[in-house]
Amino acid sequence: FIFTNGSAEHAENILTHLGVYDLFGREKVFDIKDAGYIPKPEPATFDLMAKKFDIDPKETIYIEDIAKNLSIGYERGCATVWLINDELFGKMDSDKDYISHKIENLSLFLKEIRLLKSK
């Protein structure tokens, strides 16, 4: 599932660019509108998203490019993965204990965990 502080349309464009849109589609995107315009890492927003998609956080890998947004996933029991982002806002709090793993390439990571078929 995609959990974004952006619009669903923006998420669809990014997923298409990354070549993974077919894994998700619009029905698996929870955007800022779905969140009532209350952004991550607000706990109530995370809980609303988890309820909508019937997600058990303890069985979830939470991947995020803004390090501080991983805090709520960690608190709820997710395995957390920071997609390394060199922008100042993206890397703030990237040294915190709530980050389980750090990656540089999302597509490669998805292939490694067998969510994305190799071409």
Listing of model-derived features with the role each one plays in the protein:
Residues 8, 14-119:
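Asp-based, Mg2+/Mn2+-dependent phosphohydrolase catalytic module
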Residues 4-6:
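Conserved phosphate-coupling serine/threonine residues in phosphotransfer and NTP-handling enzymes
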